[in-house]
């Protein structure tokens, strides 16, 4: 079985991928399309931008190579750090040599690697190409959503979505921004404004995809935090997977504020002191923005998010 778990950055999808990846016969693949996390992700970003926006009928040799590798279980390395280290070495090669080496390795991996019974691919860069992926690979699609204010607060702390406008990517602008009648933030926009705008854009696109495909699964990070064990078990069974004791153990341990997640570096997935004021991460995760943003910043983020047709995916839903 193939599963694509998608959402914005900081939406809780890493937590979910780690839990679901512990079901029997399952491999979780983290961010194969991330420009900073995978050499194929970097090569795709150089051609299509950080967030590719492909229509189902469009063809892309490099995007196809990326997802071919992802859905057989990713590169044959044990940890994400190994993929990043290898990618950094390869990226320093002359372009012609690098491209030839990477495509040879990618084709060999996708053809020869023995695929696990289940592969869960976790991605935060595929928002605008979900139909393209669904049409070619037929995975079960899972969209992870979260209160956008909590996403904005986390992104602001980590410097994610704060430096450039995703909506300035030509294909994203043409396919999403212009039809929505939106204008991207100016060059002097604050980090909170830019993060909120990018989160609003991505969340809108994810909501539209979910509305267009009622058969896709939508999971709420906020709901999972309220009662993690039974709700994760329900999500697991909804996907046709089996609940295991290892999954229960992970959910329980991950509630510890000192717990470090797997699937990213400490720099990318730190457990900041502002994530909780007590002994439970999940019990306060749904109000995280109140500790990470000032009241003025919350008001600023709300004002930006109000520009988007978020409906019941908005901050006050």
Which residue stretches match the model-derived regions?
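Short His-Asn-centered micro-motif
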Residues: 6-7, 120-124, 144-146, 220-222
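Glycine-rich phosphate-binding P-loop
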Residues: 5-17
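Conserved phosphate-donor/acceptor-positioning beta-strand/loop module used by diverse small-molecule
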Residues: 122-123, 133-157
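PAPS-dependent sulfation machinery
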Residues: 31-120, 166-186, 282-283
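A conserved segment at the C-terminal end of the G1
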Residues: 14-26
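PAPS-dependent sulfotransferases, especially Golgi type II membrane carbohydrate sulfotransferases
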Residues: 1-4, 180-218, 226-317
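Short catalytic/ligand-binding loop motif for oxyanion handling, primarily in non-cytosolic enzymes
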Residues: 14-17, 35-39, 127-130, 149-154, ...
């Amino acid at each position: 079985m193939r599963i694509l778990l998608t959402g914005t950055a900081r939406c809780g999808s890493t937590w979910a991928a780690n839990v679901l990846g512990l079901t029997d016969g399952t491999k979780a693949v983290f961010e194969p399309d991330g420009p900073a996390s995978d050499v194929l992700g970097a090569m795709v970003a150089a051609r299509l931008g950080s967030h590719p926006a492909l229509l189902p009928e469009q063809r892309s040799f490099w995007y196809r190579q990326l997802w071919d590798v992802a859905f057989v279980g990713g590169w044959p390395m044990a940890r994400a750090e190994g993929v990043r280290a290898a990618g950094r070495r390869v990226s320093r090669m002359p372009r012609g040599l690098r491209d030839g080496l990477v495509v040879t390795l990618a084709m060999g991996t996708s053809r020869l690697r023995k695929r696990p019974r289940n592969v869960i691919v976790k991605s935060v860069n595929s928002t605008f190409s979900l139909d393209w992926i669904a049409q070619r690979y037929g995975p079960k699609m899972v969209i992870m959503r979260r209160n956008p204010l909590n996403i904005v607060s986390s992104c602001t702390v980590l410097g994610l979505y704060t430096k450039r406008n995703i909506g300035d990517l030509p294909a994203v602008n043409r396919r999403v921004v212009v039809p929505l009648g939106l204008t991207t933030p100016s060059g002097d926009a604050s980090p909170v404004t830019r993060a909120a705008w990018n989160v609003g854009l991505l969340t809108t696109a994810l909501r539209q995809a979910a509305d267009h495909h009622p058969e896709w699964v939508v999971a709420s990070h906020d709901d999972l935090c309220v009662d993690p064990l039974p709700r994760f078990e329900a999500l697991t069974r909804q996907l046709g997977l089996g609940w295991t004791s290892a999954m229960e153990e992970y959910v329980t341990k991950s509630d510890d504020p000192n717990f470090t997640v797997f699937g990213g570096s400490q720099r990318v997935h730190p457990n900041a002191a502002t994530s909780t004021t007590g002994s439970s991460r999940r019990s306060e995760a749904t109000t995280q923005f109140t500790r990470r943003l000032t009241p003025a910043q919350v008001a600023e983020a709300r004002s930006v998010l109000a520009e988007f047709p978020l409906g019941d995916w908005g901050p006050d839903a």
